[in-house]
């Protein structure tokens, strides 16, 4: 058991250095692989669309919907992955913190690094999931299939995600201060609840889209099935993060002497593994279909 001078228990065990290093390496490898895949896919699709009117800035548009549709270019979609890769890097750095803690479990700095970064990283990855789903809806012209206003659909989910992020980040910061641990834990729990609620609602919209896309997408019969792999990746990733967040909620409800926080295997089985699987799902899924291919196909068919 590792405690601070104030008596706060940092760890109920000595963190495993080997496990932490393994996940640092895995997160770095998968992040680099998927980053290369993303940039390659974006460049390939961008070249294919270079003579497409949707890539031109002086197009005449007949409606607001057309204007929004033509804004779905390749480059802005690449930017949507920035939160994803930021979250992946935070995961790796978080486990570096755990590796450092294994040598000196009483040090607060590595503890704070791993505690805060591993807590908030999934919220950044979730932001990319929301934005990619929004682009999928727009490019397939299926905005009407979600249960909120099409204009504010993506914004709604991203704002909720940002709110969750700041609640968890603030809570993580307070937990590192003597006398504020309960307040910090409460904020973290609230942030996780917000994340679960928004993810649950998001998954409902994902399923609604999947079930009804055939009758709503005007060029459904002409488009390839690459969008199915994109959608499946988003849905699987959402469920993995949802599972991870639910376990985290239980952890903080149990308190600092609870069973989950007292046993290290929970952080790996229900946090490290699900988040690594999210990156793997995106990487493997991109071989069968990525959002850039879907944008290219839909815009070509709509032209």
From Swiss-Prot:
Cited function: Involved in inducible protoporphyrin IX influx and heme efflux.
Induction profile: By oxygen and heme deficiency.
UniProt subcellular location: Cell membrane
Cytoplasmic side: 40-76, 133-154, 205-226, 286-303
KW Transmembrane (keyword) present: yes
UniProt keyword terms in alphabetical order: Cell membrane, Glycoprotein, Membrane, Transmembrane, Transmembrane helix
Gene name in the database record: PUG1
Main location: membrane
InterPro entries, per database record: RTA1
Residue numbers on the Extracellular membrane side: 1-18, 98-111, 176-183, 248-264
Family to which the UniProt record says this protein belongs: Belongs to the lipid-translocating exporter (LTE) (TC 9.A.26.1) family.
Segments forming a coiled coil: none
GO BP annotations listed: heme transmembrane transport
Modification note: N-glycosylated.
Protein name: Protoporphyrin uptake protein 1
Membrane spanning stretches: 19-39, 77-97, 112-132, 155-175, 184-204, 227-247, 265-285
Cellular component per GO, a single term: plasma membrane
Key word Ligase present: no
Membrane topology according to the record: Multi-pass membrane protein
Top-level taxon: Eukaryota
